[in-house]
Swiss-Prot record:
One of its GO terms (cellular component) is cytoplasm. The lineage of its organism: Bacteria, Pseudomonadati, Chlorobiota, Chlorobiia, Chlorobiales. Its main location: cytoplasm. It is found in: Cytoplasm. NCBIfam families: PRK00147.1 (NF001140), queA (TIGR00113). Pfam families: Queuosine_synth (PF02547). This is S-adenosylmethionine:tRNA ribosyltransferase-isomerase. The keyword Oxidoreductase does not apply. GO terms for biological process: queuosine biosynthetic process; tRNA wobble guanine modification. GO terms for molecular function: S-adenosylmethionine:tRNA ribosyltransferase-isomerase activity.
Length: 343
């Protein structure tokens, strides 16, 4: 199996450039992974496909102000995206433009020094006056939006590129599967006996990096910090014991849970779980925790598409994607959603 096996043609007009006028009004394609059969519904009707005793897992990470422009002394503009502490290193930025070690940049009257180029468009910066780089971004930067939207961030993005339950600052991209979740829908789920719990995974560098190799074995996933409270772990155990299903809202939740479940003490620990998830999930992977997955329609050749294929089955997923394109579903972050039902 090769990366090219997960390629498909995504028409440009299928990409949702803006959020829907009202949160929660998007469409929902429901896929049965056992048969490959599909059903067409609405995100607001999610409760119709779940049952009392099920548990919905949400990522409560909050998108931070991380995108800022600086200029070189030549006048050239450089786009900077602040990354969270990554593999033990702080003050990393993803940059667009040409930089080398020793370059000096000006951003909002502050001088920044390029301390190191770490590769793949990533640099380590410092402020010349010794001030804190994250605080500089918090004062002057904007909430980043995905580059495939092909537009500048607007006022609407400050609210809509954030979930209604975002609490823990740290992501440079939203956990998009729950962008359409509303307080009303969460209340409806609760009334029907469907519980919710949260994990935190700060979406980071890997979201913006393409797969540049053809062989899965050669691709290296970047690490993303996650934390799972013990009360969430306890709810998962109780749900499983009671015959309920664990429904992951998004690939970020899935990666956090499945990485944590790889720990030898997952089944017995009475403490929170945390770490840096570098798990690469693709077809052939055996899921340990999740029983259903609510997710967006993903870009071709992406790691999140491969994770979704691992859960749904590659042919099932690609057939459903072709059907979604035929029926004019909207793709990517601000688009429609897919529910892969429990088998």
């Amino acid at each position: 199996m090769k990366v090219s096996d997960f390629d498909y043609t995504l028409p440009e007009d299928m990409i949702a450039r803006y959020p829907p006028a009202e949160r929660g009004t998007t469409r929902l394609l429901v896929l049965d992974p056992a048969t490959g059969e599909t059903e067409h519904s609405r995100y607001a009707h999610l409760a119709d496909f779940l049952k009392p005793g099920d548990l919905l897992l949400l990522n409560n990470s909050k998108v931070v102000r991380a995108r800022m422009f600086a200029s070189k002394k030549t006048g050239a503009s450089i786009e900077l995206m602040l990354l969270e502490k990554h593999e033990g290193v702080q003050n990393l930025v993803l940059y667009r433009g040409r930089l080398k070690k020793g370059d000096r940049l000006i951003a909002h009257s502050e001088e920044l020094l390029v301390e190191e180029i770490t590769g793949q468009g990533v640099a380590r910066l410092s402020a010349s006056d010794g001030s804190d780089l994250p605080h500089l971004f918090e004062r002057h930067a904007e909430v980043p939006i995905p580059p495939y939207l092909k537009r500048e961030a607007e006022a609407v993005d400050a609210e809509r590129y954030q979930t209604v339950f975002a609490e823990q600052p740290g992501s440079v991209a939203a956990p998009t599967a729950s962008l359409n979740m509303t307080a009303g829908l969460l209340a409806e789920l609760g009334q029907k006996g469907i519980d919710t719990a949260t994990v935190t995974l700060h979406v980071g560098l890997g979201t913006f990096l393409p797969i540049r190799v053809e062989s899965f074995e050669e691709h290296v996933m970047h690490r993303e910090y996650y934390s799972i409270p013990f009360r969430t772990i306890d709810k998962i155990r109780r749900t499983k014991a009671g015959g309920g299903r664990v429904v992951a809202v998004g690939t970020t939740v899935t990666r956090a849970l499945e990485h944590a479940a790889g720990s030898s003490c997952w089944g017995t620990s009475v403490a929170p779980a945390s770490g840096e998830a570098d798990i690469f999930i693709y077809p052939g992977y055996r899921f340990r925790v999740i029983d259903a997955l609510l997710t967006n329609f993903h870009a071709p050749r992406s790691t999140v598409l491969m994770l979704t294929a691992a859960f749904a089955g590659q042919q099932n997923l690609l057939s459903a994607y072709h059907e979604a394109i035929e029926k004019q579903y909207r793709f990517l972050s601000y688009g429609d959603s897919m529910l892969i039902r429990p088998m």
